[in-house]
Amino acid sequence: MKHIAIKENHLYSKAYAKGQKFVSRNTVVYVLKDLKSEKLMRANPMKEYVNRIGLTVSKKLGGAVVRNRVKRILREGLRQTENEMNLKKGYLIVIVARASIVDASSIHIKKELTKAFTSLRMIEQ
């Protein structure tokens, strides 16, 4: 499923300040209930709740090529995790890349995201 990107800076700040956090070797995952999800559900043609996803990759990690590769790896790990697990809908999810992610593969990221979402109770039964 195509994600709705978080574009407003205040939503990132809110997720950092009030969201639940899971720290792992390559990523930090923040999760916060999205208050605008009701409005987005009505606008969505399929009339279901959606998660809004934000990826944060610092310039400290490297040049544009490296940062874009890291974002592709994060998106792929998230896609694989969502295909395997039934994530709860209606949340803001912010994934922050750490320095060690440059050498990681999407398989490692998928394992970390699975562990993070399980720990944050984001899996629907």
Task: Show which residues each predicted segment covers.
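Positively charged, solvent-exposed patches that mediate nucleic-acid binding
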Residues: M1-Q125
